A protein has these predicted regions:
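An alpha-helical repeat/solenoid feature that recognizes helix-turn-helix modules
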Residues: 1-10, 25-62, 75-109, 119-166, ...
Length: 311
């Protein structure tokens, strides 16, 4: 298998080769594949890796994709799974995090849209309660809440503000401190909410998250590339030494073309999905690959590309 630097470099080659018309698209087996949500997810992941890994040409491509993302914001302030889909809080939060991560101003209308998806329990639902989809999802979703909490805590895009307190209270009661946590809205990975929640907690304050991660690991194996990438993000965030062996396992899963096997599973939970759309993987391998790249780049044993001669 490749070392970390070579794995990240090959992964970026694969990722940018799959970019079309200023955006990324995946889940092509669906009747309406995802372009908006996938592009927002990719850009948010790329914003978390050192800029030196990208280089000037790819940074320019990222800026073009950010401009595309801004251009397709809905009139309600949100973004959806694709250009035709109803706006939802998860897609909107990923778009906001992509913009903020690249030091662009997050439109206030985006935070207002997410706030409209607030539920009485303090959590954030995927859709506004008054929408047809929102009426089918009357409670908050832990993954959407964890993702949106930092956006609401810094709605102007300014870093350093505390996460939304009502959202964090919901996460404690409905995910951290229960043996029957609420299910995720879209991304079906046992480590997804945990990885998002760790981005709200400093390592020294993350003992409840560590306990939940240990619980998840006790009865779940990270047996696919997407789960392995999210597990690596969790272990790195908690500064656990096991991250080095998990990173090695993730590198062994990389394909010769630089991508990782399709394993990011989603469910279209709007209530309008056909049976064939209830559990689809990223057949273009974009989502799994960018998750793996980001996890490896953040792993503590990755040397700086500047010190290693660059990519």
């Amino acid at each position: 298998p490749r070392d970390n630097q070579a794995a990240i470099s090959a992964g970026l080659d694969f990722l940018f080769a799959g970019r079309r018309h200023h955006n990324w698209s995946d889940f092509s087996a669906l009747q309406d594949p995802s372009d908006t949500w996938v592009t927002a997810f990719v850009l948010a992941q790329l914003a978390q890796i050192p800029a030196d890994w990208l280089g000037n040409a790819r940074e320019q491509q990222v800026r073009q994709s950010l401009e595309w993302l801004l251009s397709v914001q809905g009139s309600d302030g949100g973004w959806g799974f694709n250009l035709r889909a109803e706006s939802d809080a998860e897609s909107t939060a990923w778009a906001a995090r992509a913009l903020r991560g690249c030091r662009l101003r997050v439109p206030e209308s985006a935070a207002r849209f997410i706030e409209r998806c607030r539920r009485s329990d303090g959590g954030i639902g995927a859709y506004a309660p008054e929408s047809p989809s929102g009426r089918a999802w009357s409670i908050g979703s832990p993954d959407v809440t964890a993702l949106a909490a930092s956006v609401l805590g810094s709605s102007s895009g300014a870093p350093g503000r505390a996460p939304d307190p009502a959202a964090t209270d919901f996460l404690r009661s409905c995910w951290l401190q229960t043996n029957r946590p609420l299910p995720a809205f879209r991304v079906q990975s046992r480590f997804y909410t945990c990885a998002l929640l760790l981005e709200l907690e400093a390592p020294e304050g993350a003992w409840p998250v560590l306990e939940k991660l240990c619980e998840l690991m006790s009865w779940n194996k990270a047996d696919n590339a997407f789960d392995q990438a999210l597990l690596l993000r969790c272990l790195t965030g908690l500064q656990i030494q096991k991250s080095a062996s998990v990173a090695a396992g993730l590198r062994r899963m990389q394909r010769p073309d630089g991508g990782w096997p399709a394993s990011a599973l989603i469910t279209l939970a709007s209530g309008r999905a056909s049976g064939s759309e209830m559990g689809q993987s990223d057949d273009q391998r974009i989502v799994t690959t960018v998750a793996a790249i980001c996890a490896l780049a953040q792993c503590k044993d990755v040397a700086s590309p500047v010190k290693m001669g660059g990519i």
